[in-house]
């Protein structure tokens, strides 16, 4: 033990067991002799820092699989083929078809499709099958023939021709018109609506900065649709969207052009004859004007003669010797003066 006041003792002190300090007991010696055999075992679990990191895990590769060769190089991971992302979306919970959902409030099967991050309404239908076909048509129009659809692409070969002439918006309107949820009073044909009077109204929308152009009322729905088609062709030409095949109107236009050409030729021939008639009429008019002038002159002469005879008769009645006086006045060259108290009567003869 150490003496804090004095210098430490130089004699050897013994521990509680009687062994001197600094002496190693048998237990420690045994552990010391066993320690060299334990170190190699601990080095396997905790390798020294001098070892390379690749050597530590020589028996394992990067994916956790053992390397049978023991070369220490990790095996290349297997590259799985890329999964094709489906653009058709998940199946509907209420229908077996894609893009079809049943709505209890309306009692109809409604069809929707996603385009550019927005859900587009395609219409409401009475059956899920009709709604699924509407979805397929829209998917083919928006995404091409490789789109995921409910039925075979062969069922829509006839629709592909119509899709090429329509834009997305126009094709959506076509699908909505074919649906059951389209408003009442409307027609399945483009540009045709049922008027209040019971006839079908045809009008062309958004033309020349106008909301619509009124085309008229028709007795049948087809006549109104044909009127719309003709107006659309005149405004937009070959790019016009029509209800029926534009070739039908081309044939009608050819027939109308031939009729117009024939009518023009007939008008020319009639024009020649009409010019001759005009000459005759002008000649007759000139002759009649001459006759009127002659009759006017003749009538003035006759009226003057009648007036003269009337004055003479009145003079004879007023004067007893009126004949002798009138005769003398006439022989002398002076015309008889009418009586100031009597107004002479004038006679006008009408033209025969």
UniProtKB/Swiss-Prot annotation:
Residue range(s) of DNA binding per entry: 96-152, 188-245
Subcellular location: Nucleus
GO MF terms held by the record: DNA binding; DNA-binding transcription factor activity
Pfam families: AP2 (PF00847)
Protein name per Swiss-Prot or TrEMBL: AP2-like ethylene-responsive transcription factor TOE3
GO biological process, one term: ethylene-activated signaling pathway
GO cellular component, one term: nucleus
Comp. bias intervals (Basic and acidic residues): 7-16
Induction remarks: Repressed by miR172a-2/EAT.
């Amino acid at each position: 033990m150490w003496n804090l006041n004095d210098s430490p003792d130089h004699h050897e002190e013994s521990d509680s067991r009687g062994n001197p300090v600094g002496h190693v007991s048998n237990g420690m010696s045994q552990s010391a002799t066993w320690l060299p055999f334990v170190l190699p075992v601990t080095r396997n679990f905790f390798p020294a820092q001098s070892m390379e990191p690749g050597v530590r895990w020589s028996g394992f590769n990067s994916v956790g699989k053992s390397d049978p060769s023991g070369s220490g190089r990790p095996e290349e991971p297997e590259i799985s083929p890329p999964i094709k992302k489906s653009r058709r979306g998940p199946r509907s919970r209420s229908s077996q078809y894609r893009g079809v959902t049943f709505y209890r409030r309306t009692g109809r099967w409604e069809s929707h499709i996603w385009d550019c991050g927005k859900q587009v309404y395609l219409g409401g239908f009475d059956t899920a099958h009709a709604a699924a076909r509407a979805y397929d048509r829209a998917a083919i129009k928006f995404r091409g023939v490789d789109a995921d659809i409910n039925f075979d692409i062969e069922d829509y070969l006839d629709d592909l021709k119509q899709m090429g002439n329509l834009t997305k918006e126009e094709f959506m309107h076509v699908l909505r018109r074919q649906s059951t949820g389209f408003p009442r009073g409307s027609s399945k044909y483009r540009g045709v609506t049922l008027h209040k009077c019971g006839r079908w109204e045809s009008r062309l929308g958004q033309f020349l900065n106008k909301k619509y152009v009124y085309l008229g009322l028709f007795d049948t729905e087809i006549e109104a649709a044909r009127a719309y088609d003709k107006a659309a062709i005149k405004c937009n030409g070959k790019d016009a969207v029509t209800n029926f095949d534009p070739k039908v109107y081309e044939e009608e236009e050819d027939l109308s052009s031939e009729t117009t050409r024939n009518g023009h030729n007939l008008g020319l021939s009639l024009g020649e004859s009409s010019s001759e008639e005009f000459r005759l009429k002008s000649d007759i008019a000139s002759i009649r004007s001459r006759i009127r002038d002659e009759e006017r002159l003749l009538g003035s002469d006759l009226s003057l003669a009648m007036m003269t005879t009337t004055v003479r008769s009145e003079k004879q009645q007023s004067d007893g010797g009126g004949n002798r006086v009138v005769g003398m006045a006439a022989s002398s060259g002076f015309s008889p003066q009418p009586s100031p108290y009597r107004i002479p009567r004038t006679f006008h003869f009408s033209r025969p």
